[in-house]
Amino acid sequence: MKTITTDWELIPYSEAWSRQTEWFDALVHAKQNGESYENRIIFCEHPHVYTLGRSGKENNMLLGEEQLKTIGATLYHIDRGGDITYHGPGQLVCYPILNLEEFGLGLKEYVHLLEEAVIRVCASYGVVAGRLEKATGVWLEGDTSRARKICAIGVRSSHYVTMHGLALNVNTDLRYFSYIHPCGFIDKGVTSLQQELGHSIDMAEVKERLGRELLAALLSK
């Protein structure tokens, strides 16, 4: 089956979640019934929003409802793995809706593939990134006291079909992370390509590079 890349650009989180769920359910149904389907890789950005995963703790959100309103943000409890994270303008969000069995992937291998694609994109900008033991996502200087996350990953899988995905900080306003314990960590920082390089990055270029890396990784399986 073919894999289609789609760009939703700036889209409210609730709308993106609804569309994702619709396509996810359709792929699961098609797979179970032997029907044709399309794998999708979706790119987008969101207005300021926080999402709390299934294993997340409420106290990792440091603001109350009224305080969230004052910073123009909302909070959603969602059905992915992981704890709390932030999405906002300048952050590249990627939602792959894929049949993992088609690519010979298990869930752990799939998360590793997402991490590797982001690591390669960072390297293409001269930013050395890697993994942190017992923590998903992509990190800089992960084995030091200066460890900081540049990409969060949280997925949902059912019948080896995926939704949700990754969030890469490109030109993100990092102040919004100060209102949470990102991914449940209280002793780790966050960063962005802009923060590391000292200048803004062309978002369209990052999308192109990440899309290329993801497709290459999937097709190599």
Swiss-Prot record:
Q: What is this protein called?
A: Octanoyltransferase
Q: What are the boundaries of the signal sequence? A: none
Report the subcellular localization.
Cytoplasm
Q: Where is the active site?
A: C183 (acyl-thioester intermediate)
For this chain, one GO molecular function annotation is:
lipoyl(octanoyl) transferase activity
Gene this chain is encoded by? lipB
Pfam family membership, one: LplA-B_cat
Q: Which residues form the BPL/LPL catalytic domain?
A: 35-221
